[in-house]
Amino acid sequence: MLNIDNFIGDNITFRRSSMFVPDIAANSDRLRQEVEGKSLLVIGGAGSIGSSYIKAILPFKPSKLVVIDLNENGLAELTRDLRSTYGLYIPGEYRTYTLNFADPIFERMFRKEQGFDIVANFSAHKHVRSEKDEYSVQALIENNVIKAKKLLDLLSEFPPRHFFCVSTDKAANPVNIMGASKRIMEDMIMAYSSKFKVTTARFANVAFSNGSLLAGFIDRIMKKQPLAAPNDVKRYFVSPEESGQICMLACILGNNGEIFFPKLGEEKMITFSSICDRFLRTLGYEKKECATDEEARRYAAEMPDDSKIYPVVYFKSDTTGEKGYEEFYVPGERLNLERFSSLGVIEDVSKRPLSELDSFFDELESLFALPDCHKSDIVTALKRFL
Protein backbone atom coordinates (compact mmCIF):
# COMPACT_ATOMS: atom_id res chain seq x y z
CA MET A 1 0.00 0.00 0.00
CA LEU A 2 1.31 3.45 -0.93
CA ASN A 3 1.83 5.71 2.08
CA ILE A 4 1.40 9.17 0.58
CA ASP A 5 2.93 10.99 3.55
CA ASN A 6 6.08 8.87 3.41
CA PHE A 7 6.27 9.22 -0.37
CA ILE A 8 6.08 13.00 -0.09
CA GLY A 9 8.76 13.08 2.59
CA ASP A 10 11.13 10.75 0.74
CA ASN A 11 10.62 11.98 -2.82
CA ILE A 12 9.28 15.54 -2.90
CA THR A 13 10.06 17.58 0.22
CA PHE A 14 12.97 15.30 1.24
CA ARG A 15 12.09 15.58 4.93
CA ARG A 16 10.21 12.96 6.94
CA SER A 17 9.13 15.41 9.66
CA SER A 18 7.54 18.81 9.16
CA MET A 19 9.91 21.75 8.82
CA PHE A 20 7.56 23.75 11.09
CA VAL A 21 7.69 21.43 14.13
CA PRO A 22 10.49 23.42 15.85
CA ASP A 23 8.54 26.69 15.58
CA ILE A 24 5.35 25.04 16.85
CA ALA A 25 7.23 23.55 19.81
CA ALA A 26 8.99 26.83 20.61
CA ASN A 27 5.66 28.70 20.64
CA SER A 28 3.38 26.02 22.09
CA ASP A 29 2.55 28.00 25.24
CA ARG A 30 1.48 31.05 23.28
CA LEU A 31 -0.47 28.94 20.78
CA ARG A 32 -2.36 27.26 23.60
CA GLN A 33 -3.02 30.61 25.27
CA GLU A 34 -4.49 32.06 22.07
CA VAL A 35 -6.52 28.99 21.00
CA GLU A 36 -7.62 27.06 24.10
CA GLY A 37 -11.24 27.71 24.96
CA LYS A 38 -11.76 29.92 21.90
CA SER A 39 -14.36 29.57 19.12
CA LEU A 40 -13.08 28.71 15.63
CA LEU A 41 -14.69 29.21 12.22
CA VAL A 42 -13.04 27.63 9.18
CA ILE A 43 -14.38 28.52 5.73
CA GLY A 44 -13.38 26.11 2.96
CA GLY A 45 -12.41 23.64 5.66
CA ALA A 46 -13.03 20.48 3.63
CA GLY A 47 -10.19 21.19 1.20
CA SER A 48 -6.62 20.02 1.53
CA ILE A 49 -5.23 23.14 3.21
CA GLY A 50 -8.32 23.92 5.27
CA SER A 51 -8.58 20.40 6.68
CA SER A 52 -4.83 20.37 7.42
CA TYR A 53 -5.20 23.68 9.24
CA ILE A 54 -7.95 22.18 11.37
CA LYS A 55 -5.78 19.19 12.29
CA ALA A 56 -2.89 21.55 13.12
CA ILE A 57 -4.91 23.78 15.44
CA LEU A 58 -7.12 21.22 17.24
CA PRO A 59 -4.34 20.01 19.59
CA PHE A 60 -4.48 23.48 21.18
CA LYS A 61 -8.09 22.79 22.21
CA PRO A 62 -10.52 25.37 20.87
CA SER A 63 -13.92 25.10 22.57
CA LYS A 64 -15.95 25.29 19.36
CA LEU A 65 -15.30 24.37 15.72
CA VAL A 66 -17.65 25.34 12.89
CA VAL A 67 -16.63 24.34 9.36
CA ILE A 68 -18.18 25.76 6.18
CA ASP A 69 -17.71 24.26 2.72
CA LEU A 70 -19.71 23.72 -0.47
CA ASN A 71 -18.31 20.19 -0.77
CA GLU A 72 -20.77 18.04 1.18
CA ASN A 73 -18.79 14.86 0.59
CA GLY A 74 -15.61 16.64 1.63
CA LEU A 75 -17.18 17.68 4.92
CA ALA A 76 -18.30 14.10 5.55
CA GLU A 77 -14.76 12.86 4.92
CA LEU A 78 -13.32 15.59 7.16
CA THR A 79 -15.50 14.37 10.02
CA ARG A 80 -14.49 10.74 9.40
CA ASP A 81 -10.83 11.76 9.25
CA LEU A 82 -10.95 13.72 12.50
CA ARG A 83 -12.79 10.97 14.35
CA SER A 84 -10.44 8.30 12.99
CA THR A 85 -7.22 10.09 13.96
CA TYR A 86 -5.79 8.58 17.13
CA GLY A 87 -5.45 11.00 20.03
CA LEU A 88 -6.82 14.02 18.16
CA TYR A 89 -8.84 16.43 20.29
CA ILE A 90 -12.26 17.32 18.84
CA PRO A 91 -14.30 20.07 20.53
CA GLY A 92 -17.57 19.07 22.14
CA GLU A 93 -19.23 21.66 19.92
CA TYR A 94 -18.28 20.65 16.38
CA ARG A 95 -20.57 21.46 13.44
CA THR A 96 -20.26 21.43 9.66
CA TYR A 97 -22.47 23.24 7.16
CA THR A 98 -22.71 22.74 3.41
CA LEU A 99 -23.24 26.31 2.27
CA ASN A 100 -21.66 29.29 0.55
CA PHE A 101 -20.14 31.85 2.89
CA ALA A 102 -21.63 34.58 0.68
CA ASP A 103 -25.20 33.30 1.17
CA PRO A 104 -27.73 34.97 3.53
CA ILE A 105 -27.98 31.76 5.58
CA PHE A 106 -24.29 32.09 6.47
CA GLU A 107 -24.82 35.67 7.59
CA ARG A 108 -27.72 34.53 9.78
CA MET A 109 -25.63 31.78 11.36
CA PHE A 110 -22.69 34.14 11.94
CA ARG A 111 -24.82 36.81 13.59
CA LYS A 112 -26.58 34.27 15.79
CA GLU A 113 -23.17 33.03 16.96
CA GLN A 114 -22.14 36.68 17.52
CA GLY A 115 -18.95 35.99 15.67
CA PHE A 116 -15.94 33.79 16.42
CA ASP A 117 -12.61 34.34 18.14
CA ILE A 118 -10.63 32.85 15.25
CA VAL A 119 -11.71 32.91 11.59
CA ALA A 120 -9.74 31.32 8.74
CA ASN A 121 -10.84 31.51 5.10
CA PHE A 122 -9.55 28.91 2.63
CA SER A 123 -12.30 29.29 0.05
CA ALA A 124 -10.72 30.33 -3.24
CA HIS A 125 -10.20 29.49 -6.89
CA LYS A 126 -6.66 28.13 -7.01
CA HIS A 127 -5.92 26.95 -10.55
CA VAL A 128 -4.44 29.16 -13.27
CA ARG A 129 -6.68 27.29 -15.73
CA SER A 130 -9.62 28.97 -13.95
CA GLU A 131 -8.98 32.10 -16.07
CA LYS A 132 -9.57 30.69 -19.55
CA ASP A 133 -12.49 32.98 -20.54
CA GLU A 134 -14.64 35.83 -19.22
CA TYR A 135 -17.03 33.48 -17.39
CA SER A 136 -14.23 31.71 -15.56
CA VAL A 137 -12.50 34.99 -14.77
CA GLN A 138 -15.66 36.56 -13.38
CA ALA A 139 -16.27 33.51 -11.17
CA LEU A 140 -12.65 33.66 -9.98
CA ILE A 141 -12.82 37.38 -9.14
CA GLU A 142 -16.25 36.99 -7.52
CA ASN A 143 -14.97 34.26 -5.21
CA ASN A 144 -11.42 35.43 -4.49
CA VAL A 145 -12.19 39.13 -4.15
CA ILE A 146 -15.79 40.36 -4.10
CA LYS A 147 -17.30 37.65 -1.88
CA ALA A 148 -14.23 37.81 0.34
CA LYS A 149 -14.84 41.54 0.85
CA LYS A 150 -18.44 40.88 1.86
CA LEU A 151 -17.10 38.40 4.39
CA LEU A 152 -14.78 41.05 5.84
CA ASP A 153 -17.68 43.49 6.10
CA LEU A 154 -19.64 40.85 8.00
CA LEU A 155 -16.72 40.07 10.30
CA SER A 156 -16.52 43.77 11.15
CA GLU A 157 -19.83 43.41 13.02
CA PHE A 158 -18.20 40.98 15.47
CA PRO A 159 -14.44 41.40 15.00
CA PRO A 160 -12.41 38.22 15.52
CA ARG A 161 -9.22 38.11 17.59
CA HIS A 162 -7.47 36.46 14.64
CA PHE A 163 -8.43 36.49 10.94
CA PHE A 164 -6.42 34.56 8.37
CA CYS A 165 -6.89 34.28 4.62
CA VAL A 166 -4.64 32.07 2.52
CA SER A 167 -2.69 33.64 -0.35
CA THR A 168 -0.18 32.24 -2.85
CA ASP A 169 3.31 32.80 -4.22
CA LYS A 170 1.49 34.03 -7.36
CA ALA A 171 0.55 37.20 -5.44
CA ALA A 172 4.21 38.27 -5.42
CA ASN A 173 4.79 40.10 -8.71
CA PRO A 174 1.60 38.65 -10.29
CA VAL A 175 1.74 37.68 -13.97
CA ASN A 176 -1.70 36.08 -14.28
CA ILE A 177 -5.28 36.79 -13.24
CA MET A 178 -5.08 34.25 -10.43
CA GLY A 179 -2.06 36.03 -8.97
CA ALA A 180 -3.68 39.43 -9.52
CA SER A 181 -6.82 38.32 -7.67
CA LYS A 182 -4.72 37.11 -4.74
CA ARG A 183 -2.68 40.31 -4.68
CA ILE A 184 -5.90 42.32 -4.61
CA MET A 185 -7.14 40.03 -1.83
CA GLU A 186 -3.98 40.81 0.13
CA ASP A 187 -4.52 44.55 -0.40
CA MET A 188 -8.13 44.13 0.67
CA ILE A 189 -7.52 42.30 3.93
CA MET A 190 -4.73 44.74 4.80
CA ALA A 191 -7.22 47.59 4.36
CA TYR A 192 -9.36 45.93 7.05
CA SER A 193 -6.45 45.70 9.49
CA SER A 194 -7.76 48.84 11.19
CA LYS A 195 -10.89 46.89 12.16
CA PHE A 196 -9.38 43.59 13.37
CA LYS A 197 -6.14 41.61 13.24
CA VAL A 198 -5.44 40.13 9.79
CA THR A 199 -2.64 37.89 8.52
CA THR A 200 -2.01 35.85 5.40
CA ALA A 201 0.58 33.44 4.01
CA ARG A 202 2.14 32.94 0.61
CA PHE A 203 3.25 29.43 -0.15
CA ALA A 204 3.66 27.17 -3.09
CA ASN A 205 2.37 23.79 -4.19
CA VAL A 206 0.86 21.43 -1.65
CA ALA A 207 1.91 17.92 -2.67
CA PHE A 208 -1.04 15.69 -3.55
CA SER A 209 -3.61 18.34 -2.62
CA ASN A 210 -7.15 17.93 -3.94
CA GLY A 211 -7.35 18.60 -7.67
CA SER A 212 -3.59 18.87 -8.10
CA LEU A 213 -1.61 17.21 -10.87
CA LEU A 214 0.05 14.89 -8.34
CA ALA A 215 -3.27 13.79 -6.83
CA GLY A 216 -4.33 13.07 -10.40
CA PHE A 217 -1.50 10.52 -10.66
CA ILE A 218 -3.37 8.31 -8.19
CA ASP A 219 -6.62 8.66 -10.15
CA ARG A 220 -4.88 7.83 -13.43
CA ILE A 221 -3.31 4.68 -11.96
CA MET A 222 -6.66 3.59 -10.50
CA LYS A 223 -8.27 4.05 -13.92
CA LYS A 224 -5.37 2.50 -15.83
CA GLN A 225 -4.74 5.73 -17.71
CA PRO A 226 -1.38 7.24 -18.72
CA LEU A 227 0.41 9.81 -16.58
CA ALA A 228 1.34 13.21 -17.98
CA ALA A 229 3.51 15.98 -16.55
CA PRO A 230 5.52 19.02 -17.65
CA ASN A 231 9.28 18.46 -17.65
CA ASP A 232 10.37 22.11 -17.75
CA VAL A 233 8.69 23.52 -14.63
CA LYS A 234 10.33 23.42 -11.20
CA ARG A 235 8.25 24.08 -8.12
CA TYR A 236 8.54 24.36 -4.35
CA PHE A 237 6.43 21.87 -2.42
CA VAL A 238 5.17 21.51 1.11
CA SER A 239 3.29 18.52 2.50
CA PRO A 240 -0.43 18.78 3.33
CA GLU A 241 0.49 18.70 7.03
CA GLU A 242 2.95 21.55 6.53
CA SER A 243 0.41 23.63 4.62
CA GLY A 244 -1.93 23.58 7.61
CA GLN A 245 0.88 24.39 10.01
CA ILE A 246 2.01 27.43 7.99
CA CYS A 247 -1.51 28.81 8.14
CA MET A 248 -1.94 28.04 11.83
CA LEU A 249 1.35 29.74 12.76
CA ALA A 250 0.57 32.80 10.61
CA CYS A 251 -2.99 33.03 11.90
CA ILE A 252 -2.21 32.79 15.59
CA LEU A 253 1.35 34.13 15.95
CA GLY A 254 1.35 36.79 13.26
CA ASN A 255 1.06 40.46 14.10
CA ASN A 256 -1.60 42.55 12.43
CA GLY A 257 -0.98 43.04 8.71
CA GLU A 258 1.84 40.53 8.26
CA ILE A 259 2.43 38.07 5.40
CA PHE A 260 4.19 34.77 6.10
CA PHE A 261 6.12 32.50 3.73
CA PRO A 262 8.18 29.30 4.12
CA LYS A 263 11.96 29.49 4.06
CA LEU A 264 12.67 27.28 1.07
CA GLY A 265 15.85 27.59 -0.97
CA GLU A 266 16.04 26.98 -4.71
CA GLU A 267 17.65 23.61 -4.04
CA LYS A 268 14.25 22.48 -2.74
CA MET A 269 12.60 22.89 -6.15
CA ILE A 270 11.73 19.80 -8.20
CA THR A 271 10.12 19.09 -11.58
CA PHE A 272 6.78 17.34 -11.96
CA SER A 273 8.30 14.81 -14.36
CA SER A 274 10.89 13.87 -11.74
CA ILE A 275 8.12 13.30 -9.20
CA CYS A 276 6.28 11.18 -11.76
CA ASP A 277 9.37 9.00 -12.25
CA ARG A 278 9.70 8.51 -8.49
CA PHE A 279 5.97 7.78 -8.13
CA LEU A 280 6.07 4.98 -10.70
CA ARG A 281 9.23 3.47 -9.22
CA THR A 282 7.66 3.46 -5.76
CA LEU A 283 4.70 1.53 -7.16
CA GLY A 284 7.03 -0.96 -8.85
CA TYR A 285 6.65 0.28 -12.44
CA GLU A 286 9.12 1.17 -15.14
CA LYS A 287 8.06 4.10 -17.27
CA LYS A 288 7.45 3.97 -21.00
CA GLU A 289 7.89 7.49 -22.28
CA CYS A 290 5.50 8.09 -25.17
CA ALA A 291 5.81 10.80 -27.80
CA THR A 292 2.12 11.72 -27.92
CA ASP A 293 -1.01 11.54 -25.77
CA GLU A 294 -2.62 9.22 -28.30
CA GLU A 295 0.29 6.79 -28.16
CA ALA A 296 0.15 6.77 -24.36
CA ARG A 297 -3.62 6.21 -24.29
CA ARG A 298 -3.34 3.33 -26.74
CA TYR A 299 -0.55 1.70 -24.75
CA ALA A 300 -2.53 2.03 -21.50
CA ALA A 301 -5.65 0.56 -23.10
CA GLU A 302 -3.76 -2.45 -24.48
CA MET A 303 -1.36 -3.24 -21.62
CA PRO A 304 -2.15 -6.33 -19.50
CA ASP A 305 -3.37 -5.87 -15.93
CA ASP A 306 -0.12 -7.24 -14.51
CA SER A 307 2.11 -5.00 -16.63
CA LYS A 308 5.06 -3.47 -14.81
CA ILE A 309 5.65 -0.93 -17.57
CA TYR A 310 3.52 2.22 -17.44
CA PRO A 311 3.03 4.90 -20.13
CA VAL A 312 3.90 8.54 -19.48
CA VAL A 313 3.94 11.70 -21.57
CA TYR A 314 6.31 14.53 -20.65
CA PHE A 315 5.89 17.92 -22.28
CA LYS A 316 6.77 21.59 -22.20
CA SER A 317 4.32 23.54 -20.05
CA ASP A 318 1.63 25.32 -22.05
CA THR A 319 -0.59 26.73 -19.30
CA THR A 320 -1.17 30.36 -20.29
CA GLY A 321 -0.17 32.76 -17.54
CA GLU A 322 1.72 30.18 -15.48
CA LYS A 323 4.88 31.59 -13.91
CA GLY A 324 8.12 29.90 -14.90
CA TYR A 325 9.47 30.43 -11.38
CA GLU A 326 8.20 31.03 -7.87
CA GLU A 327 8.83 33.94 -5.54
CA PHE A 328 7.45 34.69 -2.09
CA TYR A 329 8.40 38.35 -1.87
CA VAL A 330 9.51 41.21 -4.11
CA PRO A 331 12.00 44.08 -3.74
CA GLY A 332 10.74 46.77 -1.42
CA GLU A 333 8.94 44.44 0.98
CA ARG A 334 10.44 44.50 4.48
CA LEU A 335 11.50 41.01 5.56
CA ASN A 336 12.07 39.53 9.00
CA LEU A 337 13.94 36.25 8.71
CA GLU A 338 14.86 35.97 12.39
CA ARG A 339 11.58 35.50 14.27
CA PHE A 340 11.00 31.92 13.13
CA SER A 341 13.38 29.18 12.08
CA SER A 342 11.16 27.96 9.23
CA LEU A 343 9.15 31.03 8.25
CA GLY A 344 9.93 34.45 6.86
CA VAL A 345 7.65 37.37 7.64
CA ILE A 346 6.85 40.42 5.51
CA GLU A 347 6.33 43.27 7.97
CA ASP A 348 4.94 46.78 7.62
CA VAL A 349 2.98 45.86 4.51
CA SER A 350 1.74 48.95 2.68
CA LYS A 351 -2.00 49.48 3.02
CA ARG A 352 -4.40 51.02 0.54
CA PRO A 353 -7.27 53.14 1.88
CA LEU A 354 -10.48 51.16 2.23
CA SER A 355 -12.27 53.83 0.17
CA GLU A 356 -9.95 53.05 -2.76
CA LEU A 357 -10.84 49.35 -2.51
CA ASP A 358 -14.55 50.16 -2.32
CA SER A 359 -14.35 52.21 -5.53
CA PHE A 360 -12.52 49.42 -7.32
CA PHE A 361 -15.05 46.78 -6.26
CA ASP A 362 -17.90 49.02 -7.42
CA GLU A 363 -16.13 49.25 -10.79
CA LEU A 364 -15.78 45.46 -10.99
CA GLU A 365 -19.41 44.81 -10.12
CA SER A 366 -20.56 47.35 -12.71
CA LEU A 367 -18.31 45.68 -15.26
CA PHE A 368 -19.69 42.22 -14.47
CA ALA A 369 -23.24 43.53 -14.87
CA LEU A 370 -22.61 44.46 -18.52
CA PRO A 371 -24.07 41.96 -21.01
CA ASP A 372 -20.99 42.22 -23.24
CA CYS A 373 -18.28 42.11 -20.55
CA HIS A 374 -15.11 40.59 -22.03
CA LYS A 375 -12.08 39.03 -20.41
CA SER A 376 -9.90 41.85 -21.78
CA ASP A 377 -12.08 44.42 -19.98
CA ILE A 378 -11.54 42.62 -16.68
CA VAL A 379 -7.79 42.34 -17.26
CA THR A 380 -7.60 46.08 -18.03
CA ALA A 381 -9.40 46.92 -14.78
CA LEU A 382 -7.10 44.65 -12.77
CA LYS A 383 -3.95 46.12 -14.34
CA ARG A 384 -5.17 49.66 -13.69
CA PHE A 385 -5.72 48.89 -10.01
CA LEU A 386 -2.42 47.09 -9.51
Annotate each predicted stretch with a short phrase.
Residues I43, I68, V119-S123, F163-T168, ...:
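SDR active-site strand-loop-helix element
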Residues T96, L140, F163, V198-A201:
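Hydrophobic/aromatic anchor residues within beta-strands of the central parallel beta-sheet
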Residues M1-S39:
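Non-catalytic terminal and boundary segments that flank Rossmann-like NAD(P)-dependent oxidoreductase
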Residues L40-F60:
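N-terminal Rossmann NAD(P)H-binding glycine-rich loop of SDR-like oxidoreductase domains
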Residues N121, H125-E142, I146-R183, A191:
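Conserved Rossmann-fold NAD(P)-dependent oxidoreductase catalytic core, especially the SDR/UDP-sugar
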Residues R30, I189-L386:
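Strand-loop microenvironment adjacent to phosphate/nucleotide-handling motifs in alpha/beta enzyme folds
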Residues D69-G74:
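Helix N-cap at the beta1-alpha1 junction of Rossmann-like dinucleotide-binding domains, i.e.
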Residues A56-V67, R83, Y89-I90, L99-E142, ...:
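NAD(P)H-binding glycine-rich loop region in Rossmannoid oxidoreductase-like domains
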